[in-house]
Amino acid sequence: MRVAFIHPDLGIGGAERWVVDAAVGLQNLGHEVDIYTSYCNKSHCFDEVRDGLLKVTVLGDTICPHTIKGKFAIFCATFRQLHLAYELKKGPGSKVDVFVVDQLSACVPLLKLWFPKARVLFYGHFPDQLLVQNRNQMSLVKKAYRYPFDKFEEITTASADRLVVNSHFTKDMFEKTFPATKNPLVIYPCVDTDIKEQQQGLDRDMITAASQYTFLLSINRFERKKNILLAIEAFGEAQKKSSNLKLAVAGGYDFRVNENVEYLQELILACEKLKLSHISITADKYAKLLEKDTPAAVWTSIFKNDVIFFPSASNSFKNTLLHISKLLLYTPQNEHFGIVPLEGMLWKTPVLATNSGGPLETVKDNVGWTVEGKSELWAPVIDKVVHMNASDYAVLQTECVNWVNRFSQDTMASELEEAMEEVRKKAPTENVGWDYIRLGMWYSVLMTLTLSIVLLAIWP
């Protein structure tokens, strides 16, 4: 099959990790795979994209920016994806057998209209309208702005030939949010269970410098909903009993995203309030430090701090941090799935997660703990792991590896392939006639309302 993935912004994050893993997995099964995206920065993406293992084409980025004065992100993302679909109509999309759209469903009906022989599979990470923060506190104007987009999401999601989701928790959320969706298929994301090659790329100088400390690790995008503050506060409590304890905070960070920049500063202020020394290490800063000293000396100096931030950590840094850490702290509440806990288990690192959402399906009692997200409840678990005897910890590590093998890339790719083959055998989902008229009406309302708000916002 010729498969085309469509993703809004191919940066670094859980959704992007899924796209890359799914594309590589299908490619390994012999399928011809292309990824189309509205934005891809080769200095802020996964190695498979940067190194050319996957064919990535940027379309639909020439008319609309990412935001308008830092606002209207959903409007811009929707417009850019529709523009991308239009560019596919000019030629590249005509040979595609299956489109795999994820994260944003705006283009689904257009793909079905313009490419009637192809099938469209939508992979839902979570209903977008449920990701809006402080929704109940939104002003009337903002609610009016969001309403057409929410209806648009409902109609376009239901137009897909097959809806696939990342967990049973997410399945429940889609069924409650979009009653028209029928029995979404659950295909869990994966981790690459063969880490031999990744082990060769570990930073040995970092490992040596870290050997005299006990490390905790948090991996998440620098967003408020990821609740990284919980890791810092729990670490601050636990460090009172273990002075050689360190916390590494790594994750996706994009300087274009205001929240990423603001939240990192909020976390730094939290460290200062708790009297925790800290340092932020970016790729550029690390390179500059190496100009003045040896790698071993650089890491020795860095690890004198209590909390070390790694914005946009490379795979090598992230894997090394997983290798040296005693416990992974996974802080989001009601996370849709959460690939990070599985990555931790892959490196024999047990997990402490909040007792909600997808982690309840992945973090079992024999590989970690799910605890209410309060620092006073997390600190005792951290203390327990830090002082666990070697034999008990070794048993925990073995169970981690045994469990994570159920989430291999081969398993996910095979399940995705089966879903695509099944949907190709069936007639396409009916979404013509009145459905298109209804969609057009909502789209007209959406565009009119949004453009009015935009004009009011930028009018001098």
Curated annotation (Swiss-Prot):
State the protein's name. Alpha-1,3/1,6-mannosyltransferase ALG2
Spell out the InterPro entries in the cross-references.
ALG2, Glyco_trans_1, Glyco_trans_4-like_N
Transmembrane segments in this chain: where? Answer: 439-459
Q: Per UniProt, what is the membrane topology?
A: Single-pass membrane protein
Name of encoding gene: ALG2
Q: Which reaction does it catalyse?
A: a beta-D-Man-(1->4)-beta-D-GlcNAc-(1->4)-alpha-D-GlcNAc-diphospho-di-trans,poly-cis-dolichol + GDP-alpha-D-mannose = an alpha-D-Man-(1->3)-beta-D-Man-(1->4)-beta-D-GlcNAc-(1->4)-alpha-D-GlcNAc-diphospho-di-trans,poly-cis-dolichol + GDP + H(+); an alpha-D-Man-(1->3)-beta-D-Man-(1->4)-beta-D-GlcNAc-(1->4)-alpha-D-GlcNAc-diphospho-di-trans,poly-cis-dolichol + GDP-alpha-D-mannose = an alpha-D-Man-(1->3)-[alpha-D-Man-(1->6)]-beta-D-Man-(1->4)-beta-D-GlcNAc-(1->4)-alpha-D-GlcNAc-diphospho-di-trans,poly-cis-dolichol + GDP + H(+)
Q: Where does the UniProt entry place glycosylation sites? A: N41, N389
Q: A Gene Ontology MF term for this entry?
A: GDP-Man:Man2GlcNAc2-PP-dolichol alpha-1,6-mannosyltransferase activity
Query: Quick one: a GO cellular component term?
Result: endoplasmic reticulum membrane
Q: Does the keyword Membrane apply?
A: yes
Its localization reads: Endoplasmic reticulum membrane
User: Which Enzyme Commission number(s) are listed?
Assistant: 2.4.1.132, 2.4.1.257
